[in-house]
């Protein structure tokens, strides 16, 4: 029987080959993703193996969910131990792990209270609902008139509220009507609230007036292509929120948990939001966990029966999340991300190939912008296909931007190997033609268009 890349036998629920997995997904699953054609069968740390046993370095980290590395043994142990004891109680009853998680996570990040959910999109929805509650009950906004604003090119998820905030046409097409009074345009105009545009932000607050309940923002825009704002952008947002009695909500679902060289990315600006949204790496990729952290007076606007989740705060999730956060501290991942991120960006800049137009990022959340006018007809997708052949996995966003975000356990040697692969791939790409091109980029993978990818 095929080993399935796992040093053991495949089971009935493991595809026995890359071809079988891709064909079955194409036949039986909705086509809402276009994955890079590689199949994960086993992973450890920064390493991934496909069913045939081929090895790759993971430079996406499940969109920064596996900051602690794939299948971290301490997280596996926490998961197995709790799974054999108690997995789910619902919030109809107390369990003996959620209270420990609630105390730990609030102290760990320096907030008063937490509301647990499961996915990042649920955390966004919860934050929006809490902000509206606060707007009506505390600020005194007239019923059904609360406004929630975000910035252009944001990514806050795929739910109706999230796409109502979005400016991405593909995310919104044929999903209307959208949730009213939330968006990323200046109220009363069609002008976007351009990210990192301080004048646009001031105008948005002025035009929204007293009905503005919250401004929701990513400290670094991830899906937009790792857009790092000026140091004073979040400082201005904090100041405007204070002046106008508005809640500042930071979406740290992708940027948080040590990814950018700070525990939370907004710390780079020296500000503190009223609410923080967390997900992804809060559980190290072991289990869906998310939460909203905030001030006590804000969080207590939500009364029993007005919001919840059957799985939110379940003991299995909480046990894994506690251990995941402990591992971040024990293994100095904040410091590692900052040090190794600087080295990685320096290495990317040293490649000095005109195909790499821009290098940007913080910590180990980075991106290269590909100048497709210099690739001899190839795309960033083609470059990712070529890097895959050489053993490195990454994906484009917004067509010509490649996000590079490995697990924070990556070693200096693995970074050096990744830089070698990237350098070789950008040098080889313009000359990739004929049979060699068809081998690397087979017909189904040609002319692939990628906008948002999460």
From Swiss-Prot:
Main localisation: cytoplasm
Ordered alphabetically, the record's keywords are: Aminotransferase, Cytoplasm, Pyridoxal phosphate, Transferase
| Protein's organism | Emericella nidulans (strain FGSC A4 / ATCC 38163 / CBS 112.46 / NRRL 194 / M139)
Q: What is this protein called?
A: Ornithine aminotransferase
Pfam families, alphabetically?
Answer: Aminotran_3
Q: Which Gene Ontology CC terms are recorded?
A: cytoplasm; cytosol
Q: Name one GO molecular function term.
A: pyridoxal phosphate binding
E.C. no: 2.6.1.13
Question: What is its subcellular localisation?
Answer: Cytoplasm
């Amino acid at each position: 029987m095929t080993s399935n890349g796992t040093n053991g036998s495949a089971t009935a629920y493991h595809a026995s080959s890359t071809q079988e997995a891709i064909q079955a997904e194409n036949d039986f699953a909705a086509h809402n993703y276009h994955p890079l054609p590689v199949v994960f069968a086993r992973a450890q740390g920064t390493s991934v193996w496909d069913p045939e046993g081929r090895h790759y370095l993971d430079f996406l980290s499940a969109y920064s969910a596996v900051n602690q590395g794939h299948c971290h043994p301490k997280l596996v142990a926490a998961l197995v131990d709790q799974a054999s004891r108690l997995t789910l109680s619902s919030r109809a009853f107390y369990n003996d792990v959620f209270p420990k998680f609630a105390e730990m996570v609030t102290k760990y990040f320096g907030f008063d209270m937490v509301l647990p959910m499961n996915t990042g999109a649920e955390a966004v929805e919860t934050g929006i609902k809490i902000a509206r509650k606060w707007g009506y009950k505390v600020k005194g906004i007239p019923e059904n008139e609360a406004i929630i604003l975000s910035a252009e090119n944001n990514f806050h998820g795929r739910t109706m509220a999230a796409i109502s905030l979005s400016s991405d046409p593909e995310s919104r097409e044929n999903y209307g009507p959208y949730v009213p009074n939330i968006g990323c345009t200046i109220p009363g105009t069609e002008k976007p609230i351009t990210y990192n545009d301080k004048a646009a932000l001031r105008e948005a607050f002025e035009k929204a007036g007293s009905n503005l309940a919250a401004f929701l923002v990513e400290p670094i825009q991830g899906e937009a292509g790792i857009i790092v704002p000026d140091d004073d952008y979040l400082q201005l947002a904090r100041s405007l929120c204070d002046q106008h009695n508005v809640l500042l909500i930071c979406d740290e679902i992708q940027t948080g948990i040590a990814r950018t060289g700070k525990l939370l990315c907004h710390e780079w600006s020296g500000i503190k939001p009223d609410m923080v949204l967390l997900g992804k790496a809060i559980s190290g990729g072991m289990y869906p966990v998310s939460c909203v952290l905030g001030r006590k007076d804000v969080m207590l606007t939500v009364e029993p029966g007005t919001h919840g989740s059957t799985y939110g705060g379940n003991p299995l999730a909480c046990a894994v999340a506690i251990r995941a956060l402990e591992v971040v501290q024990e293994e100095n991942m904040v410091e590692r991300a900052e040090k190794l991120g600087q080295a990685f960006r320096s290495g990317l800049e040293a490649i000095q190939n005109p195909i790499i137009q821009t290098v940007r990022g913080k910590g180990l959340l980075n991106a290269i912008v590909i100048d497709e006018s210099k690739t001899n007809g190839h795309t960033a997708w083609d470059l990712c296909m070529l890097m895959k052949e050489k053993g490195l996995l990454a994906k484009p966003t917004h067509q010509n931007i490649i996000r590079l975000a490995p697990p924070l356990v990556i070693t200096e040697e693995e970074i050096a190997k990744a830089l070698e692969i990237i350098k070789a791939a950008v040098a080889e790409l313009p000359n990739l033609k004929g049979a060699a091109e068809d081998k690397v980029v087979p017909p189904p993978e040609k002319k692939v268009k990628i906008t948002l990818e999460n």
